[in-house]
Amino acid sequence: MASKKGIIITIIILVAITAASFVIWQMPTNLQMSVVVSDFNLHIIGIDERYKMISNANDESFEEMIDGKISPDEYISIAEISSSQINSQIIELVESNATDEWIDSYLNNLESLRSYNSYIRETIILANLINGNAGIDEKSDILIKIEQLKQESKEYSKLSISSRP
């Protein structure tokens, strides 16, 4: 005959196994985050504001590097963080599933962010050239490309604003 203590321990073990299997069964298998946008105007305005903060900080750091106030290595660290933040915004725009009336504005904003990210990559190349004591011709070619990419980003940003419903 079974003792009370043995029956209680058996019941506790069965409850623990049942609870653990239930918890495991309830755990989500798809851990990807998705962006659900209900107000596309506020969403794109938020993206624009974050972009302005990131670009202002990065541009300021770039000027400080050019002026010799910070080292190229310090700038590269800052630029890589800025690039990562811009990439996050690009992903956010892509995953937002903009409606037909907002798609043009979102696509132009996306191109603006991509151009700015290319701009950041070119500034990193310039920082590496400064570290390596490259020739003036190489640096001036990169500076021209940097300005073109920055201007392209601004133009796409204006197109994004003008194409909003």
Regions found by a protein language model. Name each.
Residues 22-34:
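Hydrophobic single-pass membrane-insertion segments
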